[in-house]
């Protein structure tokens, strides 16, 4: 029977070849007249008329080769003949017509073939497995390929006829003798029985593949339509043609589509060959199945898959073909024995499983190009020129030492005579396919070397999205998988122990058993490596680039890690600062409240307040620490600090202390400068309990508050409440300049003719006696005691202030030697202010010292010298020393010419009427005892004022003269308020260089009255 192939390249032309003669005529098909396909695509029609069984002779094949030298021939067809027994009928019937949508990519390009569902036009089923005469083994089938691009009528097949003649010439030389064929029948039968599957559910149909080598000249073709134009150039030389397409069993791969030819065989043989099994020995034929066709709506169909180079080793072989019919399924086994030198050192078996989609169906038999082995329609093979003869043997894959690791194929490095080949590198990247084109599988198994039975399984799973290539060698299975690394997109060289176990079990039980779906899906985890795969060829040629690439890939992660660590460290430090601030705030509030506890203890017992306050503070600190540790842990976990709640503290103080600040401000803001109280000249306690004394005591209390918050301040606060004194704490601290001004502004408001020595000091003497029992432990109290002792012994004191640190007692004695200084005492303070007290025996010497030495420089620094005691006056030490310069400070502050500024300053209380005087006299007596108790509680030696305690002249305490002056001025200017009169007195003092000493009361009244009249005239 002779097979005739007709290829029609456009709508009106077809080329017919019969027996090697080319005819440019219209093909007439006796049964099917419609030879044209829709969509303007190229048509392929295969006819096998019955009764034509003559084979081509050698001369005819030579003629074919000569006639095929015509350039630009749009025809590629092969004729093959097989001798068949007369008993076999209808071996090949009319083939089916297909609507084809074909893409081809050639040499470094990809192609995909889309076939629509096959429409079987004939009821005669193609018999793939029929009984043939053993003599057919000497005849070799000829392959032919038909390229049909979509939407393009050009088929650039070049010199395909010439290639056909060359291939036929090689086939004639490589025919296998009948004698050599019969020798292997027995061995092949034994191998066939061993590899033949018994269980129909686990057996897959297999078709063996042969290799054909064509020597063709270079040509170029295009693919039209909506597909990308692909150009390929095929080099001259032998091209191995490997085909192995088998269908999986339903158990292994549920998505395997059944070939229409298999279904037809099932329908044809089911009534006739039920439970029938036969084996046919000694036939050589070429069977070509269609490749797995992808029909996916995804635009990712035209994806590119690795392109390995496959080389064939010419050798003689004999095949044993077996086919089984189990009810509704047909299984075929074929073994190929290699009597000559094999390419692998060990005998191996090659199996090529391919996974198919449910939506794709295998069409009827058609012919693929010999230079392309399509695994899932994406693999591409290229061959280099190699002399040799045609031999229908299995292809051999080999690599050189430099290319033992090849992308896209699992090629084993082999040492042998015929291994001087090179494997192709990855030329294209696998694109990620859609979900409907991800599981295309086909299984092809080939058995090598029946006698050895040492199997090497090379499983190639090629899909649009997953390509899994495995090679297992029995002697070194672990080493191979450990040394090989995937360099292709979605290519996994080692599927793990599970895949190896499944494959070993499949090979041990039956070589035809397909791999498990788990093994086929192992390559799905390689989608992320597509970026790295582009650089794999460079890594193979330049190993140093791989190390550089690793460093570059690791650099961003290290940089990000360091940046994150720095950010966490900075936020942790900021959180620590916030915690310390909150902690300090809690302690500050505690000290402040405890310092004022004495003033508030009139409503709360002291012990109860202290306990409750301490408990509240501990609770606040514990809660603060807990929230701090919680925030710190979250920061270490990577949560930004700005997204966390701020670290704050809430004061859980007692309700009794909650209004402490408001009450304190209220007491400070309270001013009773408009009081009309006047002190009587008959009451000595009026002089003793003067406002200056009260302010001095308040200064002492504030000093002790800042150093010892826990000390009681009850006497001080009682004085504040009972006397209603306006205390401005901001003016209790003086700098050196203010101190000098205070010393210079010693106010001697007294009448020169008035002497106060006749006054009874009985009450004050009692206080003096009690004050001698004090336990002075700070410099302030020591100074008071020293002054008291000096006053009693000498009676005349001189204050020398502003001493530099280098001034010693000897220096002062040398400067004040002519003034007959009997005793010198030097005092230091924390503010680097030093002063000295000098005792003079005579009043004249003291006055002369003040007049001459005031402003004199001692060791480079000028000093201010003032007189402390005036002759004829004896003031109790406590009262005289307690009268601080605070009263002078108040007068100094209120010396501003602006009348509005004077209203906000502290003012000295004015004596009221006689009734008020008697009331105050009764209140002042117990307050003096409170002052003594308060002074007894001063324990620390570190509680020194920022400025030293200044000695105030005793005339400041003589309020009787001040009362007289205010009374006279009020009588002269009744329309002027008391505040304005006091401001006028201050202005007079400032205009008189800050001193009113030596001026009589009448002079002071005249000067003040004149100032008031001038001010009133200016206002008008």
From Swiss-Prot:
In-chain residues carrying the UniProt-annotated modification Phosphoserine: 249, 371, 374, 516, 683, 690
Biased amino acid composition, Basic and acidic residues: 58-70
Keyword Chaperone: no
A cellular-component GO term for this protein: intercellular bridge
Domain RRM span(s) in chain numbering: 796-870
Listed InterPro entries: Nucleotide-bd_a/b_plait_sf, RBD_domain_sf, RRM_dom, TTC3/DZIP3/RBM44-like_helical
Pfam (any one): TTC3_9th
GO terms, biological process: mRNA splicing, via spliceosome
Region (Disordered): 1-23, 50-70
Alphabetical list of Gene3D superfamilies matching this protein: 3.30.70.330
GO molecular function: protein homodimerization activity; RNA binding
Keywords annotated in UniProt: Cytoplasm, Phosphoprotein, RNA-binding
The protein's role, per its UniProt record: Component of intercellular bridges during meiosis. Intercellular bridges are evolutionarily conserved structures that connect differentiating germ cells. Not required for fertility.
Summary of subunit composition and partner proteins: Homodimer. Interacts with TEX14.
Name the UniProt record assigns to this protein: RNA-binding protein 44
Origin species: Rattus norvegicus
Gene: Rbm44
């Amino acid at each position: 029977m002779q097979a005739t192939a007709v290829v029609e390249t456009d709508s009106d032309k077809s080329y017919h070849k019969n027996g090697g003669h080319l005819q440019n005529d219209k093909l007439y098909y006796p049964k099917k007249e419609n030879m044209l396909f829709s969509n303007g695509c190229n048509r392929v029609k295969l006819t096998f008329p019955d009764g034509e069984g003559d084979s081509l002779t050698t001369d005819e094949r030579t003629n074919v080769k000569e006639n095929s030298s015509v350039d630009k021939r749009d025809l590629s067809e092969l004729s093959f003949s097989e001798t068949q027994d007369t008993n076999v009928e209808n071996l090949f019937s009319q083939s089916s017509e297909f609507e084809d949508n074909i893409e081809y990519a050639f040499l470094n390009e990809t192609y995909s073939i889309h076939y629509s569902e096959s429409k079987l036009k004939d009821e005669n089923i193609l018999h793939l497995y029929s009984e043939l005469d053993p003599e057919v083994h000497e005849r070799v089938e000829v392959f032919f390929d038909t390229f049909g691009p979509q939407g393009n009528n050009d088929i650039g097949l070049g010199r395909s006829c010439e290639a056909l003649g060359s291939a036929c010439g090689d086939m004639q030389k490589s025919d296998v003798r009948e004698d050599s064929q019969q020798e292997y029948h027995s061995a092949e039968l034994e191998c066939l029985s061993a590899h033949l599957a018994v269980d129909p559910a686990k057996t897959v149909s297999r078709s063996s593949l042969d290799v054909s080598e064509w020597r063709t000249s270079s040509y170029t073709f295009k693919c039209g339509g909506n597909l990308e134009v692909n150009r390929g150039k095929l080099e001259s030389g032998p091209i191995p043609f490997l085909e192995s397409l088998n269908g999986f069993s339903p158990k292994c791969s549920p998505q395997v589509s059944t070939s229409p030819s298999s279904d037809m065989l099932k329908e044809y043989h089911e009534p006739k060959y039920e439970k029938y099994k036969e084996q046919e020995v000694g036939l050589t034929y070429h069977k070509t199945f269609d490749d797995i066709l992808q029909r996916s709506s995804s635009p990712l169909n035209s994806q590119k898959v690795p392109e390995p180079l496959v080389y064939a080793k010419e050798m003689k072989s004999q095949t044993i073909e077996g086919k089984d019919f189990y009810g509704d399924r047909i299984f075929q086994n074929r073994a190929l024995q290699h009597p000559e030198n094999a390419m692998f050192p060990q005998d191996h078996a090659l199996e090529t499983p391919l996974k198919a989609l449910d939506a794709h169906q295998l069409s009827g038999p058609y012919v693929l190009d010999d230079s392309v082995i399509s695994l899932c329609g994406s693999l591409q093979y290229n061959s280099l020129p190699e002399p040799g003869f045609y031999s229908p043997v299995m292809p051999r894959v080999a690599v050189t030492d430099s290319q033992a690791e090849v992308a896209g194929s699992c090629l084993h490095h082999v040492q042998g005579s015929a291994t001087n080949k090179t494997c192709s590198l990855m030329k294209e990247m696998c694109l990620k396919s859609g979900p409907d084109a991800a599981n295309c599988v086909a299984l092809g198994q080939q058995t090598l070397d029946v006698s050895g039975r040492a199997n090497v399984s090379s499983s190639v799973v090629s899909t649009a999205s997953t390509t899994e290539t495995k090679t297992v060698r029995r002697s070194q299975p672990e080493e191979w998988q450990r040394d090989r690394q995937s360099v292709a997109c979605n290519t996994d060289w080692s599927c793990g122990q599970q895949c190896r176990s499944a494959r070993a079990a499949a090979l041990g039980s039956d070589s035809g058993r397909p791999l498990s779906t788990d093994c086929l899906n192992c390559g799905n985890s390689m989608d992320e490596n597509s970026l790295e795969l582009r650089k794999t060829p460079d890594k193979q040629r330049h190993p140093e680039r791989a190390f550089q690439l690793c460093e570059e890939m690791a650099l961003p992660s290290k940089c990000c890690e360091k940046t994150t660590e720095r950010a966490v460290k900075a936020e942790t430090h900021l959180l620590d600062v916030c915690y310390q601030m909150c902690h300090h705030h809690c302690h500050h509030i505690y000290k402040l409240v405890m310092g004022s506890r004495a003033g508030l203890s009139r409503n709360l017992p002291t012990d109860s307040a202290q306990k409750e306050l301490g408990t509240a503070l501990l609770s606040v600190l514990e809660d603060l620490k807990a929230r701090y540790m919680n925030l710190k842990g979250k920061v270490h976990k990577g949560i930004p600090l700005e997204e966390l709640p701020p670290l704050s503290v809430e004061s859980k103080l007692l309700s009794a202390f909650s209004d402490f600040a408001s009450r304190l401000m209220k007491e400070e803001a309270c001013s009773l400068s408009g009081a009309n109280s006047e002190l009587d000249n008959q009451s000595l306690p009026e002089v003793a309990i003067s406002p200056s004394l009260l302010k001095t005591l308040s200064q002492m209390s504030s000093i002790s508050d800042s150093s010892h918050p826990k000390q009681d301040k009850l006497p001080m606060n009682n004085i504040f409440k009972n006397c209603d004194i306006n205390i401005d704490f901001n003016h209790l601290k003086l700098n050196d300049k203010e101190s000098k001004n205070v010393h210079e502004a010693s106010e001697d408001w007294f009448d020169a003719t008035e002497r106060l020595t006749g006054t009874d000091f009985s009450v004050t003497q009692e206080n003096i006696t009690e004050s001698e029992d004090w336990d002075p432990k700070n410099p302030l109290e020591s100074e008071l005691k020293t002054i008291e002792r000096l006053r009693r012994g000498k009676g005349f004191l001189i204050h020398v202030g502003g001493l530099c640190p280098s001034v010693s007692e000897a220096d002062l004695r040398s400067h004040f030697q002519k003034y007959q200084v009997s005793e010198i005492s030097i005092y230091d303070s924390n503010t680097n202010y030093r002063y000295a007290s000098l005792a003079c025996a005579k009043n004249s010497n003291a006055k002369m010292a003040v007049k001459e030495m005031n402003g004199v420089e001692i060791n480079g620094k000028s000093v201010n010298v003032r007189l402390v005691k005036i002759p004829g006056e004896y003031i109790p030490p406590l009262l005289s020393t307690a009268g601080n310069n605070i009263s002078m400070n108040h007068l100094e502050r209120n010396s501003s010419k602006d009348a509005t500024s004077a209203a906000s300053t502290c003012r000295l209380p004015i004596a009221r009427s006689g009734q008020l005087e008697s009331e105050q006299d009764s209140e002042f007596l117990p307050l003096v005892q409170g002052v003594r108790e308060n002074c007894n509680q001063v324990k620390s030696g570190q509680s020194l004022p920022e400025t030293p305690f200044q000695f105030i002249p005793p005339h400041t305490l003589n309020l009787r003269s001040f009362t007289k002056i205010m009374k006279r001025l009020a009588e002269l200017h009744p329309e002027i308020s008391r505040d304005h009169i006091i401001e006028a007195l201050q202005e007079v003092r400032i205009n008189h260089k800050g001193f009113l000493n030596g001026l009589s009361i009448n002079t002071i009244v005249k000067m003040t009255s004149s100032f008031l009249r001038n001010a009133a005239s200016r206002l008008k």
